[in-house]
Amino acid sequence: MNRREFLSLGTCAAAGVCLADAVPVVTPEELANADFDAALKVIWETTLHDVEKRKAALGVLQKHIYAMKTGRPFIQALDRGLTIPSDELAALHAKHPVIRWADEAFDKVVRELKETVVTGDVPAVWYLYNMGVVVKTKTCAFAIDICHRKAAELAPLLDFALCTHAHGDHYTDAFVAAMRKAGRPFVSNFVLIWNWYCNEAVKDLEIKGVRIHVTQTDHNQYLPKSMLCYEVFCPGAKPFVIYHTGDTNRACQIEGKLLTREPDLFFAHCAIGFSFPEACRNTVRAKLTVPLHHQELGHLGGRWRCVGFHEEPARILRELGDMGLKAAMPVWGDRII
């Protein structure tokens, strides 16, 4: 068992979550790679707004995620990164098509990042995995919480990266090393890089014309002030504002910390206790709210990995819809804007 697996076990145990037993049982008869391929084709041919068109396909993909049971194959692939031989990778993709989906999603985001030209004030925004988003403005490209086995390939395309906290489902060592090798800023509260280390209650940065208001919150009662929240003002006559709260676990934690009450995009954890209705009533009324951290495979079980499309995220979308707010739930590789 490596360090990442050990920490994943500890996190689940601390939360009182049974590991493999927390995952719904899926029988081999329910799984077929042909069905998975057909479902994934639907995803690539639709957008996050095509909820009904995607519904059946998402159910198929979720079964394959549950079938991985502990998530260990994903964790091992994440740790090995780009060193997996091609023949071994092909076998891994065949046995666990969910990992192939994650890789195809990464390739899609990289391809579209290269091809997309942004001319106005509204950036292009993609969802990669877990809490990871990639943003391209008219002047630069950046990312938040990038965790993927191929993440190092993304570094040369970015002008900087932000990380909310030091948990292995929000960054990889290979990505940090690639950012440093490329001479790109990596902002965090755990990597000691001159100018880009943040451990203050409030800090303001500017990189490539992007203004970043950084504040602290708690991950949980055992990890106080361990989270960096980023309120990002993309350059433009009317700055496009992205607010990313990482694994902040209580809505009251963000009260009084935003410079604007109405960001354009609001990202928060869907299954850690964070109340989206409370946050939207009291603090942030975004033009689009996006719950993330569903289908997280890096933990060895427990609700974080097993949150499916028909559970917490779906409930959050209903609650926000009842409040007259717009919300969306992307899957890996989706372009959000």
Residue ranges and their predicted role:
Residues 173-179, 254-258, 275-284:
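A short acidic, amphipathic alpha-helical/loop segment
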Residues 5-26:
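N-terminal export signals
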Residues 197-211, 224, 236, 257, ...:
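Binuclear metal-ion centers of metallo-dependent hydrolases, dominated by the metallo-beta-lactamase
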Residues 146-194, 260-267:
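Active-site metal-binding motif and surrounding structural segment of the metallo-beta-lactamase
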Residues 243-244, 265-268, 289-291:
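Structural recognition of the beta-strand scaffold that forms the well-ordered cores
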Residues 26-156, 195-261, 274, 331-337:
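Core dinuclear metal-dependent hydrolase active-site scaffold
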Residues 150-151, 167-171, 193-195, 221-222, ...:
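Active-site environment of divalent metal-dependent phosphoester hydrolases
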